[in-house]
Design a protein with these regions (language model features):
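Short helices/loops that flank or line small-molecule/ion binding pockets
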Residues: 70-82, 126, 160-181, 188
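Periplasmic-binding protein-like
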Residues: 28-30, 106-111, 187-226, 245-261
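Ligand-binding cleft/hinge of the Venus flytrap
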Residues: 51-60, 102-103, 124-128, 136-158, ...
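Short beta-strand-to-loop elements that line the ligand-binding cleft
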Residues: 61-68, 151-166, 198
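Extended ligand-binding regions for polar small-molecule ligands
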Residues: 45-57, 117-118, 125, 130-131, ...
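Ligand-binding clefts/hinges and TM-proximal coupling segments of bilobed small-molecule sensing domains
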Residues: 61, 139-154, 226-265
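Extracytoplasmic small-molecule ligand-binding "clamshell" domains
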Residues: 18-97, 134, 156, 221, ...
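Acidic, polar ligand-binding/catalytic clefts
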Residues: 64-126, 136-140, 198-200
Length: 265
């Protein structure tokens, strides 16, 4: 009888462990089309849909932890969360801990944009002394030397959507945006109101990384992400939100193909 009870307990514990949620971290500065946060909880968006589909295909419930951006990496290191998506290794040169990275899932250019209805190509180094709309805490390697010499000044907003709103309101002549956010923002504007790219600042491949822990089905997660990418599911999710293929960018206008840190995320 005692052996039978012990066996039942082990089965019960195994069942609970099997249903432990897959914990994703989401920076609270993310906005659409990445994620829409409602009362601190994600409800829709490209990355929300991808993460939810990943957990479903892995066979685990998804659990989302919305944290200030400054706490995201610490949460990974402390084992509070298991997966971080929309990241690149070059953003985390001081990364400590044991992680395994997925294949690249998205390619995301950072753009210098303007409200000018007839934009011309711009070399940032030729810009006169002025403020550039940027996201608080984000790094822009191509522009940093110009910030360091005070040729340009950062005009920080808390998230990418606010940067675009300020540009639309005429607070700045130029701002920095990722391609997704620009495409999403322009969807609600009339053609003569839309914001336009004048140069590609940098372009970065981004993916997910997983905490390498025996409690986390790391290889199952990585294999599932490969399937989702190769099947076209991830690209189709992007198209669902930004409407067709992202606007083409002129590679000849790229000032530097140097990876940035958290571009537009």
């Amino acid at each position: 009888m005692r052996l039978a009870l012990g066996a039942l307990l082990l089965i019960s514990l195994d069942s609970v462990a099997a249903q432990a949620p897959l914990r994703f971290v989401i920076p609270d500065s993310w906005t659409m089309p990445m994620v829409h946060l409602e009362q601190g909880k994600p409800t829709q968006g490209i990355l929300y849909d991808v993460m939810l589909s990943l957990a479903t295909q892995v066979g685990l419930p998804a659990e989302f932890h919305v944290l200030p951006r400054a706490r995201v990496q610490n949460a990974m290191e402390q084992g509070e969360v298991d997966v971080r998506c929309y990241a690149a290794q070059s953003w985390l040169p001081q990364q400590s801990g044991d992680y395994i990275w997925s294949i690249p899932l998205f390619t995301q250019p950072d753009l210098l944009i303007t409200q000018n209805a007839r934009p011309t190509a711009v070399n940032p180094a030729d810009l006169s002394h002025q403020s550039i709309g940027t996201v608080l805490g984000y790094s822009y390697p191509t522009l940093q030397p110009l910030f360091d010499t005070d040729q340009l000044h950062r005009d920080d907003a808390r998230n990418q959507e606010l940067v675009l709103e300020k540009l639309l309101a005429g607070r700045n002549r130029y701002a920095v945006s990722n391609q997704w956010s620009l495409d999403w923002f322009n969807q609600r504007l009339l053609p003569d109101q839309q914001l336009h790219s004048v140069v590609v600042l940098q372009e970065q491949n981004v993916g997910c990384y997983v905490r390498n822990d025996p409690q986390v089905p790391v290889q199952r997660i990585l294999r599932t992400l490969v399937r989702m990418k190769m099947s076209g599911e991830i690209d189709e999710t992007v198209r669902l939100y930004i409407g067709g293929e992202p606007a083409a960018v002129d590679k000849s206008e790229t000032t530097k193909n140097r990876p940035g840190q958290d571009p537009g995320s």
